[in-house]
Amino acid sequence: IKYNHGNAKRINHALKVHNYAKTIAILEKVNEYDLFNLESAAILHDIGIKVCEKKYNSTEGKLQEKEGPAVAREILENLDYKNINRILFLIGHHHTYINVSGLDYQILIEADLLVNFEEENTSKEDIKKVYENIFKTKTGKKFCREIFDISL
């Protein structure tokens, strides 16, 4: 919250992604270690946006993936996090939907998409396409169908 002081939209986005990620992970029975890393990555997943705006005048997802890990590293090291490599990997790949390695990675993608669909007023047709191609977890699929009232 401190990092995005004054920007309620970004703060709320991070909190919503975190809450979806945590809920999906618990229902998918993710172990405590991976859950901790996933929650950390979820709350920080868009942390590179400010740098991207200053450096590129853009908030494009691939640029966030490029710049986010360095910002996150500084924050996590200041908080005495020890094993940060997976968290940084997740932050650096959360807009990459191919070669998804790990349940934590899949859940972060799904949580971010659920929030983005709502925030960007994504059409049901587009949501259905993304659902069919990207969503993999039982819980993420269920949430997507129920939240956006999509039928298959």
Predicted segments with their positions:
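Divalent metal-dependent phosphate-bond-processing catalytic cores, especially two-metal-ion Mg2+/Mn2+ enzymes
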Residues: 3-31, 44, 79, 95-152
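Active-site metal-coordination segments of metallo-dependent hydrolases
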Residues: 5-16, 54-67
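An active-site-proximal "capping" alpha-helix that borders the catalytic cofactor pocket
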Residues: 17-24, 62-77
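Short, flexible helix-adjacent loops and helix caps
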Residues: 29-30, 52-56
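His-Asp-centered metal-binding catalytic motifs of divalent-metal-dependent phosphohydrolases/nucleases
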Residues: 35-54, 68, 72, 88-96, ...
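Residues forming well-ordered secondary-structure scaffolds
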Residues: 63, 67, 86, 102, ...
